[in-house]
Structure formats: structure tokens, C-alpha cells
Amino acid sequence: MGQKVNPHGFRLGITTDHVSHWFADSTKAGQRYKDFVREDIRIRQLMSTGMERAGIAKVEIERTRDRVRVDIHTARPGIVIGRRGAEADRIRGELEKLTGKQVQLNILEVKNPEMEAQLVAQGVAEQLTSRVAFRRAMKKAMQSAQRAGAKGIRIACSGRLGGAEMSRSEFYREGRVPLHTLRANIDYGFYEAKTTFGRIGVKVWIYKGDVTSKELAQQAAAAPSRGRGASDRPGRPGGADRGDRRRRTDRPAAEAAPAAEAPAVEAAAPAVEGGQA
């Protein structure tokens, strides 16, 4: 049976970017690739435990030689910052103890939480934990996302839905969710609801539209600032103007030389070759 690949990994370099930005080629203990991966996992686990009410959508990690930068994208920055920055200082201290390096902590607010798949999945899971009917929670989340501007949304819940003896999966979809279109900007989120009768997994796909228009705008804005190169030749980026090669009907008229000149050119050619020899 068919399986669904993670939309973020499927579109890396096209519509999505890595959430960890660093490079490791050292063989020293603590600076190897596997050490950094383990450290990233622990940092994200630290952000997820005890911060459920903060609505953390994404944690980005960037490393330099002696510093680690952690960007927290949250729907409620006040909870992460705390009173007079006390909570932010506590998080920074725990991160410095975990990494052993200086930590730069940036707290960024999510402007539209209804369009963030991770936050939508977390919201549905919290309602399931509060014994809200799963169909009502799913449909309410889909309506909120569509009002916020989503072109399509799909929500899937798996587990002992409604406390049933047999676990099953159910999903609802509104609008278009083209999972195989690489230019489609699709956000994906997953969260687990811990209920009294077991865990229920919630998956959310949100289709925000194609990125072609955005890419064209970025290319148009970056075109004047480029240096000299093949792409700066006049008329070539658009593909419509190719200079003399465009009008092929003009060539016969230009090549129609008098017949009397042809023997003279041919006769002069051996003399030139003999002179060079």
C-alpha cells in the first residue's frame, strides 16, 4: 500500500529549508556529526517539555565555532519570555549547560497560528485530551485554517478514537492538498494526544499555494543587483529576443550575393593558402 513521504523532506531546497544550519567535519569527540545531531535532538526535547502552552511551531538551530543560536517560533512569546525575561534566562541557562557554549536565544512570534500545521495539530490534540469529540475538533480546525487563508487542509487522526476497542484512522479534507506537486507550499505537522484510553496521533497538511509567483518576484528583485554574466545579456532572460537568430527569414536576402563574386572569392582562396604555406 502507498505511504506518504514527509512533505518537508520531500521539498528541501525547493519550498522548505533545513531547520538546523551547521557543518561538521571534525573527528574530535563532541564536535562530530553524530554529536551535533544528538545535541539538536536534546535541544528540541528541552523546548517541547514544559512548554506545551507556549505553542512552539518550530525551533531553528545554527552553530558557529563557539556559539549556538536558537530561534524559537512561537504563537505566545509572552509565555516563553516570562515575567521580566525570567523564563528566557532560565531556558538560555539550560541550553548553555547542555551545549557547553554561549547560546544566543531569539524568540520570534508566529503571526498567523491558524496557518501553521504544527500548531493546528497541537490544538486538535489538546482538544482530544480534553474529551472533545474528534470530528468536532477536526472540522473546527479546518474551518479556522480556511478562514485564515489556507487553500486546502487535511487532518488525520489515528488511535482509539472515541474510546473504541479497535483503533482506526479517520481523516477529513477541505480544498486541494497536492502532495506530489513539488512547487506546492505544503506545511506539515504532527502531535500526539495523551488520553486516558491511549495515545492518538494527529497529522495536519496545509496547502498555502504555489511558490512560483514568489520565486518570480524574488528573481525580478535580485536581477538588477547581479554582476556581469551570461544571464545579464540583453534580451536573453525572457527568451523572446535572441538577436539576429530570431529572424531566419532575413538570411536568404543577406546571403543572396551576385553570382559573379563567388568565383573570385574561390579563386582568391588558394592564393591565400599558398601564401601562408
Swiss-Prot record:
Query: Positions of the region Disordered?
Result: 218-277
User: Which intervals hold domain KH type-2?
Assistant: 43-111
**PROSITE patterns in alphabetical order:** KH_TYPE_2, RIBOSOMAL_S3
Q: Where is the composition biased (Low complexity)?
A: 218-228, 254-277
Disulphide bond pairs: none
| Annotated Basic and acidic residues bias | 229-244
Gene Ontology process terms (BP) = translation
Asked if the keyword rRNA-binding belongs to this entry, the reply reads: yes
For this UniProt entry, the molecular function terms from Gene Ontology, in alphabetical order, are: mRNA binding; rRNA binding; structural constituent of ribosome
What Gene Ontology cellular component terms go with this record? cytosolic small ribosomal subunit
User: Any idea which UniProt keywords this protein has?
Assistant: Ribonucleoprotein, Ribosomal protein, RNA-binding, rRNA-binding
Q: Function of this protein?
A: Binds the lower part of the 30S subunit head. Binds mRNA in the 70S ribosome, positioning it for translation.
The similarity annotation says:
Belongs to the universal ribosomal protein uS3 family.
Subunit structure of this entry?
A: Part of the 30S ribosomal subunit. Forms a tight complex with proteins S10 and S14.
Q: What is this protein called?
A: Small ribosomal subunit protein uS3
Name of the gene encoding the protein in the UniProt record: rpsC
